[in-house]
Amino acid sequence: MKVNKKIRLEDVNEKNWRIPLSVSEAQRAYVADRVNMLARAYAYRDARSRAYIIFHEDIPVGMGLYYDCPTLDAYIFSEFFIDERYQGRGLGEEATRLVLTRMHEDGKYRKVVLCCI
């Protein structure tokens, strides 16, 4: 699986959690905002939740979240978005590949369940 070296994931932490990222008004009914994503990451911390800021080069362009689901023997790929200013450039596809690579490298599960809220 080829991954764009300009895309990287950084764990959400005390220095980056306030980065202002959002989707367009039309997309808000379908995508959790940054605050709700962080709340879900906190709520699922016992399920090894992993919340990431997605960077293209050194620019934050989006966020993603997944966590373990032992009852389904899978990772739940719960939240993902690319900021409206950076959509349409293939960054979401590349970042998704990188998240899936992280899951594969972790190796706990062989299955991914997509969550649609």
How does the language model describe each region?
Residues 88-93:
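Glycine-rich acyl-CoA binding loop
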